[in-house]
Structures are given as structure tokens and as C-alpha cells.
Amino acid sequence: MGKRMSLILGAFLSVFLLVACSSTGTKTAKSDKLKVVATNSIIADMTKAIAGDKIDLHSIVPIGQDPHEYEPLPEDVEKTSNADVIFYNGINLEDGGQAWFTKLVKNAQKTKNKDYFAVSDGIDVIYLEGASEKGKEDPHAWLNLENGIIYSKNIAKQLIAKDPKNKETYEKNLKAYVAKLEKLDKEAKSKFDAIAENKKLIVTSEGCFKYFSKAYGVPSAYIWEINTEEEGTPDQISSLIEKLKVIKPSALFVESSVDRRPMETVSKDSGIPIYSEIFTDSIAKKGKPGDSYYAMMKWNLDKISEGLAK
């Protein structure tokens, strides 16, 4: 009986050690991958489209949350400290307002343009116009697909610099991704060119569509200018309603990452319906419409053009 028990125990230990070794091997293989951190779901999705499974990727701001103001979790601090490369938007997004990202990388002892990089580098910046934010950069450059292409090229450039052994994969994926975005951009311009000029007005909660407006020739109006200021005050709401009495657009839109109630008040008091939810600061959860940068931009372009054409 003792001998049999020894054999069973020996077999068990052999299996245990085999599993443990296998597990350790997997862990080591994973740790060999480039450790990449992106500040939000949009940048993370672009990075994933270019890098695929060649990297370990962590996105800081959860899907559906506001990247302007965020309190990093312990996991975010750990991942940032251990990252080989960090991608952030810049131009007054994560480094505006309470500057949560600036504090995060400082505490992690990371260096700009060595460890962390602004993916917006090289875009033509548009500036805010409101009294409290006048002269500050408008961060929402990705809402112009041409800027999304610049973001993607900046991401690929740093991935290649940090991980040259996978250069061929990054270049191949970038080429396919850029072609896809260029095709969508061309289709969007045709759609908006076909809409009558007197119907062209995007009305949103946050004034985040300036880059979109410039790219596709559609002016914008909003309740508040940027999410770092007061949002949906009575004065902001009444000011927009007065404008809408003159302009009379056919539809309103509300962003997925903001409180719907201010726009619902505008809709009720103006008699103008909310046509659709749209995406600005975040992609959608996996499996939902808008669950990638490409998908969210296609959704926005389709819904806005449909709403304005009514």
C-alpha cells in the first residue's frame, strides 16, 4: 500500500511540475513581448490594429469613461511603471484639466519622447474659443480620419523603434489599416457633399466636433465646449436653445461618454429630436456597434449624415 501511494504521489508531482514548467514557459514568452500602455480605448484600438498579438497592451481609461478627467487605478500605475512604450493623445486631453496623465508618468519616472509619445504629433491643432478655455488646444483630433491616419503612423513608428524584430508585421498592418481609413474618409466626404448646405449642423453636448467640421464641411454647435469645464448648466442649455430657434436643425446628437440629460432637456425644450448616440471619447464595448476606431467613425459618419439629411 505504501509503495502504491509513493507511486501515485510521484506521478502527481511529475504532472504538477510539468504543468508548472509549462505555465512558467508561457509567462516568460508573454514577458518577451513589448509592454505597451495606451491612455484610452481609441488609441489602444489603433495600436492593436497595427501590432496585433505582437505586444502586451493595457488601456488605462475604461471604455465609456471620460479621458479628460480620470483617477488611475493601482493596476494603471503598475502597468505604466513597467511599460516599454506609452501612447497618449496630448493636446489638452489627458494632460489638460487635472493633468492626471502628467502626474502618472512623473510618478512612474518616465521621460517624454523616450518612454511616452503623443500620437497627435504633426496634426494641425484647432484651438478652443470659449471664455474659460480660450486659446487652449482642442484635443479631439481623431474625429477627422486624416488625423486618425497620422495617429496610426506615429504609433507604428514607435513600435518599430522599440521592437524592430516585428517591423515587417507593423508595416504590413499599418498599410492595410491606413488604406481602410482612407477609403472611409473618401466615402464620408462624398456623403456630406451631397447634403444641402442649410441642413449641415452637428449639435452635440460637448463641442468636440471642430476637427470633424473642418474635415467634412459641417458646422457644429454644442452645450459646453470641453468636458473639463462645467457641463450642462442652465445658462449653457438656454444659450443653445436660443441658437436652435434661429438655425432649426433637423436632429440632435448625444455622445456615448457624457450624461444624456442636458441634451434631453435641449430636445424637449426645442422640439428637435435626438437622432442618435454617437462616439467621441471612447469606442463601444466589444460586440456592440462602434467597438473599434474604424467602427465608431463609420457609425458617426453614417448616423450624422442620415440625421442631417432628414
Curated annotation (Swiss-Prot):
The keyword Ribonucleoprotein does not apply. GO terms for biological process: cell adhesion; iron ion transport. InterPro entries: AdhesinB (IPR006129), Bact_metal-bind_prot9 (IPR050492), Lipoprotein_PsaA-like (IPR006128), ZnuA-like (IPR006127). Pfam families: ZnuA (PF01297). It is a lipid-anchor. GO terms for cellular component: plasma membrane. Residues 1-20 form the signal peptide. Transmembrane segments: none annotated. Keywords: Cell membrane, Ion transport, Iron, Iron transport, Lipoprotein, Membrane, Metal-binding, Palmitate, Signal, Transport. GO terms for molecular function: metal ion binding. It is found in: Cell membrane. A lipid is attached at residue 21 (S-diacylglycerol cysteine). A lipid is attached at residue 21 (N-palmitoyl cysteine). Fe(2+) binds at residues 68, 140, 206, 281. Part of the ATP-binding cassette (ABC) transport system MtsABC involved in iron import. Binds iron with high affinity and specificity and delivers it to the membrane permease for translocation into the cytoplasm. Has low affinity for Zn(2+) and Cu(2+). Belongs to the bacterial solute-binding protein 9 family. Lipoprotein receptor antigen (Lrai) subfamily. This is Iron ABC transporter substrate-binding lipoprotein MtsA. The lineage of its organism: Bacteria, Bacillati, Bacillota, Bacilli, Lactobacillales.
